[in-house]
């Protein structure tokens, strides 16, 4: 049921489990990309998609309270908080002499703090009356940070400050991460929203969007193997989404080719 006209069906997968699954996968992927640069895009990019899926699931839950056009906006907010947190996690260790291996964990901790603060601000002074807005902003900030750091690390081949600055910031790749991961987090529920929305169908599209973000990065890096694997994974996931949509629809009408003349 929708909490506020948002079009939210019953949950098949508990949010906290999806969140934990996405966080663990993305963190593992970040460390794999750092320690094994040759596998950075293949495995790091794949596992970074887990953060996108978990973020899309949280977007679905909070947007069910009737955010309306706020569905895309909250996805962008997620990546805004995530970008700040990821950059802080990358730069603080080099500035204060901390071990570089704490970077992903530090970014995650900062993201949780930033998300909590932003969530509180949306209650007061903004005045949003969504009961789960604070916890949702916290989770979205975390997933945004892990997605940004995950894809940037996969592209650059590591998460130390010098590698990220030269391999993901100076060349503008972090902007690509912002858009690709942001779309993967906001689009699934925005596309499936409505009275006939189902958790399974929305999450299937979320997986497809996560794979598409990975595919975009694989193409940008000119990684042939990762591009081929990501394309196959995306094709399977999106094909499953289309089949699920056709099965759930009460009626399917195929639009003929537009007439060439009146």
UniProtKB/Swiss-Prot annotation:
Topology relative to the membrane: Multi-pass membrane protein
Recorded GO CC terms: plasma membrane
Catalytic activity: 5-methyl-5,6,7,8-tetrahydromethanopterin + coenzyme M + 2 Na(+)(in) = 5,6,7,8-tetrahydromethanopterin + methyl-coenzyme M + 2 Na(+)(out)
Top-level taxon: Archaea
Keyword Membrane: yes
Ranges in coiled-coil conformation: none
InterPro entries reported in the protein's UniProt record: THM_MeTrfase_su_C (IPR005865)
Cited function: Part of a complex that catalyzes the formation of methyl-coenzyme M and tetrahydromethanopterin from coenzyme M and methyl-tetrahydromethanopterin. This is an energy-conserving, sodium-ion translocating step.
Oligomer status and interactors: The complex is composed of 8 subunits; MtrA, MtrB, MtrC, MtrD, MtrE, MtrF, MtrG and MtrH.
Protein name: Tetrahydromethanopterin S-methyltransferase subunit C
UniProt organism field: Methanococcus maripaludis (strain C5 / ATCC BAA-1333)
